[in-house]
Amino acid sequence: MSTDNSKIIYTITDEAPALATYSLLPIIQAYTASSGINVETRDISLAGRILANFPKYLTKEQRIDDALAELGELAQTPEANIIKLPNISASIPQLEAVIKELQAKGYDLPHYPAEPQNEAEESIKLTYAKILGSAVNPVLREGNSDRRAPASVKQYARNNPHSMGAWSKESKSHVAHMASGDFYGSEKSVTIDGATSVNIEFVAKNGDVTLLKSKLPLLDKEIIDASVMSKSALVEFFETEINKAKEEDVLLSLHLKATMMKVSDPVMFGHAVRVFYKDVFAKHAATFEQLGVDADNGIGDVYAKIARLPAAQKEEIEADLQAVYATRPEMAMVDSDKGITNLHVPSDVIIDASMPAALRASGMMWGPDGKQKDTKFMIPDRNYAGVFSAVVDFCRENGAFNPATMGTVPNVGLMAQKAEEYGSHDKTFTMKAAGTVRVVNSQGERLIEQEVAQGDIYRMCQVKDAPIQDWVKLAVTRARATGTPTVFWLDENRGHDEQMIKKVNTYLADHDTTGLDIQILEPVKACEFTLARVAKGEDAISVTGNVLRDYLTDLFPILELGTSAKMLSIVPLMNGGGLFETGAGGSAPKHVQQFEKENHLRWDSLGEFLALAASLEHVAVTTGNARAQILADTLDAATGKFLDTNKSPSRKVGELDNRGSHFYLAMYWAQALAAQTTDTELQASFSSVAQALTKQEEKIVAELNAAQGPAIDLNGYYFADTKLAEKAMRPSETFNTILSALL
């Protein structure tokens, strides 16, 4: 039996999954130790990435390696086996909060310079820019995405359906999007013929040329596109829809993805803030200028910065802000008790989480009075607004989906090598003046030209040919494995998709598709086709580009399972390695708030269990380690029993939480290992563990639950004290002693 090269990298990330790791990782390391599998960690947390990027500001003892860069290189090798937990895609307010916390702990980091005054500050801002937004996933995702609900999870959801709000045919909820002037309407796209490099140039009205991006290398057959979001059209859209929401008597909400689309979406968010609160911004323009208020950071930035003003001036501005609410429509709230609105912070309302939540809740959001109400969902760009609109219309007509009977929608997502919009950040610009932006190749040919006005957002995206070939192959593989109708969600009327459709048709011809139902539909039609099947209890595989991959792998799991954290998320890396992502949910800051308040962590680690089983199976297949396969099979059995016996964490303090759920997984896993007969040595070593855990079950659960109740301080939110966190997450001495016997 070969156990060489059996190494799994388990990532240290942020917030709730990071806390859960303190409890779960020791179990994983204990159970894999005798099978020749090394489970190592790498810190890709937000705090860790900041420290890794500023070594010259730190003492020798404070410096840490750049784990993300290391994993990015590893992902391009056949040896890669990485379990990736959710991490923070940082907004600027979050980034500033981490910097402040680290500075308070003696790390002499530079402040984030929002408006750099010199070259040194420019350089600091550029370094921080690499850490903002979705800085982790594009580096690790050297493959396309295969996301699905495992059979055991889907069956559990059918047997224990989560709550779904009833829909009324009279619901006034609807999606509002632009009719023109958006990215969709302006997109132009070409396929590159022969490797080259391009410059992105801005040509002013007077003919002056400014270089926006130089020598961007492009491969043969790569698709590029460029599009523009018109500032004037966007502002007019916000003006119109805000007024309409008042007339229609619905809540007003805005759904963007300011975390991932870190350059474009905060700017769009800022325009909504300035339009909604235009009277306040006009009246106090000089004060806001002096304070450095940035609407792109939300109206919360105004509240934060006026705190420095003399009391009378501060109160005047607060009264003016309050007066706005009397003349404007009611806004959807993030926290009605605290008065936190949809427009407070750009990272508070993220479309892939906020829209499914509203769809589950009768198409409503929460108003300022703490009650649910029909809502206008503003999704400015037409590229993806129609998909959400189709779901709203379907539910209004047909009622809410039934989790006990509905089908499932696995996704095959194109994302390798920073595909499409999610690789666009270094090619997205807010235009300082009117003119033309052109993409010019090394031969001087103009590939794409776009007219722009001052304040418009210009965005160029790219997708390489090899990832598209791999994506088509993965789609055919899943269609063949399941026999499920498989739909490419592509719109021939969109510039980029028109090029994609040509490639999909070409590469589908390379595969045997006999007997398979594979079709290409524009996203709204694809969504309607899928919804109709799912409502009848039938399945449909969605094959999508990068953004829809992100949106649909939240939308359907949340409707089907109540959460996207329970998805199996496999990224078969293009060079033979494996990346195993634990669910599609975020890092759950609200779970941490509850943990700090009453030492109860409700994070559900099911995503980690599923990813670990897939990772162990990958070890078995790639290294011939037979014990890894036994560990994977028994873990699957344990996870099934975990679901059947309902040992997921409760939301209520004093009941089973994340730590208790880990104990039950460990007990069921040990029992399964003790029951298998393929490897008698492994069976013998786990028999005593299974007996001890079974015998001490009551005592261990009592010890774990007894820790709950009082508030807990880990001396840090983003950069907790590891000793305190370990102590807090492993409070059962009995359990710890039994585990230590395996090491």
From Swiss-Prot:
Residues engaged in binding NADP(+): N87, S89, N137, S587, H591, R602, D604, R651
Cofactor notes: Binds 1 Mg(2+) or Mn(2+) ion per subunit.
Domain of life, per lineage: Bacteria
Catalyzed reactions: D-threo-isocitrate + NADP(+) = 2-oxoglutarate + CO2 + NADPH
Binding residue positions for D-threo-isocitrate: S134, N137, R141, R147, K257, Y422, R549
Cofactor: Mg(2+); Mn(2+)
GO molecular function, one term: isocitrate dehydrogenase (NADP+) activity
The enzyme's E.C. designation: 1.1.1.42
InterPro entries from the UniProt entry: Isocitrate_DH_NADP_mono
Keywords noted in UniProt: Glyoxylate bypass, Magnesium, Manganese, Metal-binding, NADP, Oxidoreductase, Tricarboxylic acid cycle
A GO BP entry: glyoxylate cycle
Binding residue positions for Mg(2+): D352, D550, D554
Database matches in Pfam families: IDH (PF03971)
Family: Belongs to the monomeric-type IDH family.
Biological role stated in the UniProt entry: Catalyzes the oxidative decarboxylation of isocitrate to 2-oxoglutarate and carbon dioxide with the concomitant reduction of NADP(+).
Assembly description: Monomer.
The name this protein goes by in its record: Isocitrate dehydrogenase [NADP] 2
Organism: Colwellia maris
